[in-house]
Regions:
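Alpha-helix capping/helix-boundary segments
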Residues: 8, 40, 72, 97, ...
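A conserved hydrophobic position in a structured secondary element of the catalytic/binding core
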Residues: 4, 36-37, 68, 110
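General small-molecule cofactor/ligand-binding pocket signal
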Residues: 35, 66, 127
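Generic structural signal for small/hydrophobic residues in well-ordered secondary structure
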Residues: 5-6, 44, 76, 101
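Short, well-structured N-terminal submotif of metal-dependent ribonuclease cores
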Residues: 1-36, 45-58, 133
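A general structural signal for well-ordered alpha-helical segments in protein cores
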Residues: 22, 41, 53-56, 73-76, ...
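Acidic, PIN/NYN-like endoribonuclease modules and their adjacent C-terminal/linker elements
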Residues: 1, 98, 102-133
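Active-site neighborhoods of divalent-metal-dependent phosphate/nucleic-acid chemistry enzymes
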Residues: 64-111
Length: 133
């Protein structure tokens, strides 16, 4: 199971992203194992213009959603404390996304190196991609 992070979606949907980068990302979004998480949807829709939000929602409808049960919020807080104990400062939504991935035993696919740091303090499985294109 794969959880596609916000960073891939942003680069894939941004009109200014180079086509080679979009071609690099597309197989991940089309992978049958690809899933969304509610915090990722929130991050993407938060700043989207109305027409962009409609397009995103249409794309999101094609992927299964990993739920964020109430226990995951506590797990995210615990993860944040573990990171802080190792001197890592991680934003709250990244902790929540990581906790969702851990809860569902999904591999998080991302360009965001902060998740590699989170993986140092947990069992988080991360596929850290490098931007090509």
């Amino acid at each position: 199971m794969l959880l596609i992070d916000t960073s891939l979606w942003v680069d894939f949907t941004r009109s200014s992203s180079p086509e080679p980068l979009k071609r690099q990302i597309a197989p991940w979004l089309l992978d049958p194992a690809a899933h969304l998480a509610e915090p990722v949807v929130f991050e993407l829709l938060r700043f989207a213009r109305p027409h962009e939000a409609q397009q995103l929602e249409a794309q999101f409808a094609t992927l299964p959603m990993l739920a964020t049960p109430s226990s995951v919020w506590i797990e995210a807080a615990e993860l944040g404390r573990a990171c802080r104990a190792k001197g890592l400062t991680v934003i709250s939504l990244d902790l929540l996304i990581a906790a969702v991935a851990l809860h569902h035993r999904a591999t998080l696919v991302t360009f965001d190196r902060d998740f590699a740091s989170i993986a140092q303090t947990s069992a988080l499985s991360v596929r850290l991609l490098e931007r090509g294109g």
